[in-house]
Amino acid sequence: MTSRSSLLAGVAAIVLLSSPAFAEDAATGDTSVNNPQTSSAGTGARDDDDAIIVTARRRTETAQEVPLAISVIGGEHIDSTGAFNVGRLQQLTPTLQFYSSNPRNSAANIRGLGAPFGLTNDGIEQGVGVYVDDVYYSRAASSTFDFLDVDRIEVLRGPQGTLYGKNTTAGAINITTRKPTFDFEGTAEVSIGNLGFKQAKAAVSGPVIADKLAARLALSATSRNGTIYNVTSGNYINEQDNLGVRGQLLWEPNEDIDVTLAADFNKQNPECCGTVYVRTGPTQRPLNRQYEALAAAQGYAVVSTNAFDRLTDVDADLNAGNELGGASLRLNWNVGSGTFTSITAWRFWDWKPENDRDFTGLPIVTKSQNPSQQDQYTQEFRYSQSAKNLDFVVGAFAFHQQIDTQGTEQHGPASSRWNISPTNPLSNDPTVLDGLTAINTQQLKNTSLALYGQASWKVTDAFTIQPGVRLNYDKKSGYYDRQVFDGAGVPVLNGQTGARRAAQLAIFSPQSYSPEGSDWNFSYDLTLSYKIAPTVMVYGTYAKTFKSFGINQNGVPNDASGVPALAAQTVRPESVDHFEAGIKTQIWDRKATLNISAFRTDIKDYQANVTNGQFGTVRGYLANAEKVRSQGVEVDFSIRPSERFNAYVNGSYVDATYRKFVDAPCPPELSGGGTGAVIAPPGVTGNSPANCDISGQRLPGVSRWSVSVGAEGNVPANLLGKDGQVYLGVDGNHRTRFSSNPSPSAYTWVSGYNLWNVRFGFRTDAGFDIFGWVRNALDEDYFEQLNVPGGNTGLITGQPGDPRTWGATIRAAF
């Protein structure tokens, strides 16, 4: 890790120091490089022509002309604020939420919707689509990689199925990279900071054949020590170790045709991902089977009860190694008054994890890993045309995905005492569960075909009608097989008798099933927009859309008789009704922008990720919640009174709740007890309900209030004979508390927090920039999420957010 990152950092530094940007006569490059204020709507910065250009509707237009709630973040703003992945991007866009316990278990949500909170299940679609240069990335792991050579990012809020290849019910993250150029140009950047942070980026572009063939190559490497110290291994864990490379060839045989061939490769290999002890919360288990008693029985004490000591003692190997990449071929052909576009793409993802799933320093679970390999193929054809009063886009999309997973989970010598009741003599025999192993084999084949279209009819100069439709076909087939072996390698089978087998089957039960299904769905939307004035537009949208059915790829829970509940192997599709109204305004000679949107999204048969208390058997599975609603208001305000100052305030109120979920799994304080008719109070030993009614309670991971603010000021200055600007920038983000468990629990509310970032530096119009930065400047202690480990012992662990980090960046263009 260190040698690779240092090597690239050295290469980037050499390029940087040799850059003509250090010369008096350095040529000015393109605007995207040389004007650091060419950033984004909602950040107080604007393009030179006072308009933020986007392609959200598959045509080039200004963001203020799009009747849609959209945030646009320019590549320069991403670089200057250190928002180099989706996790950091959420600090700039309040209604974007990102959660990750490791690259596989990552989710991006918009307005509280998108992907269920918790462990990832390959059998469902993402509600928030991630696109890079119009190529759909089906794996949420792509959200954990560093942005590479990005020109801008558009965060589209609300359903996007009638314009995008893959149907997305909550929104889309549309990433556009910088394209090859027929003039030679390049950039180089090096950053260093505390915690051993090192990041290097470089990009070069230029002609191969004058006016016919151009190429672009970009590289990025990031490394940083972990933020949690593991006293068992002596290593800092949850480190960063990213490497990425992207190459493009642009061929323009004539004025009507351009063809782009692109390929990328990304690799991560960090020692990750662990959590820390946070607290215990009483469950309804017998007291001698709750965490304090179980730990005391084995003479175990946590290394620290203060989570922000950032200490752990997990004893299993940790690794989050994965590789992601692919290739695409894009054709744009001007045909008559329109443009035909073809995008052919292949992507892969290889996941090689190692985890500690008992979250302690005891050898309870000694191995937990689900390595996975995915291949994805997409083909999209699109035709767009713009006329005086009518613009339209029609397209066809095909998607095929195959995922193969080989899982292993193994228990150790401390498992018997931890998992078998102390009243059972077998609890004192380590050999009962030591070496007990589950081998899981999973396969998923997912095919989706779609036709879609959207038209924009300008009825008058002020009034526009925009209808859209989508016809979708989905077919999925899966396979799940779990085989169980005892410590001697003898198969453990359902129906076997004897006390030892009963204890082993209570941990792992064999199961095998092959879910499959297919479905047709029709979606549509209608948007009406009206320009009250040249810089004031109001709009309203209704969308009827869906998320395709899902299949449980991580196993299903056992029923009351201990037999796998095969009825749970599939979940119904979501049916979505979305309403939105908004106003977009610019005032003060376009120096100030104020956009307001109000929305309500009702979902029937919401695909929720729920948990049960069977230790190691099924930690999470998919189920349908009858009704869910997300509603709220978003406000984006930015101002730039002069080129010397800009500021922004983006805020949102989101009320996302289960409107009806009467048979949800219960939170830990109502779990782990007996099965009698009289239910004990929460956290009191006794009987537990089979299910809980959580109707009216909040969806996990969603803060009611979120606010992002920022400002930057600059003054003219001369440094070492170079004219430029000295600048000071501040960005802040506030989130109120949110639930961190699928069924809200008193033990897993994450408190609200405030994060402030500061940067101070000097830059020139020629593209040279040097600045120091501090992230989480006030060193706020906060959690990204809290976790409820399996077993209903009452243990709560957490993932602390980054502490204060600081460093410096030097960047140049040539």
Residues of each region from the PLM?
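N-terminal Sec signal peptide and the immediately downstream disordered periplasmic leader
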Residues: 1-81, 87-92, 255-256, 327, ...
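Acidic, small-polar-rich N-terminal luminal/periplasmic segments of exported/outer-membrane proteins
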Residues: 46-183, 581
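Outer-membrane beta-barrel translocator/receptor signature
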Residues: 125-127, 139, 148-157, 162-231, ...
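Periplasmic-side early beta-strands and strand-to-turn transitions of outer-membrane beta-barrels
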Residues: 174, 182-183, 191, 203-301, ...
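Structural signature of Gram-negative outer-membrane beta-barrels, strongest in the C-terminal barrel
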Residues: 250-254, 383-384, 395-399, 442-601, ...
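Membrane-embedded beta-barrel scaffold of Gram-negative outer-membrane proteins
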Residues: 330-334, 339-355, 531-550, 554, ...
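Gram-negative outer-membrane beta-barrel transporters
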Residues: 391, 595-602, 623-740, 813
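C-terminal beta-signal and adjacent terminal beta-strands/loops
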Residues: 733-743, 762-814
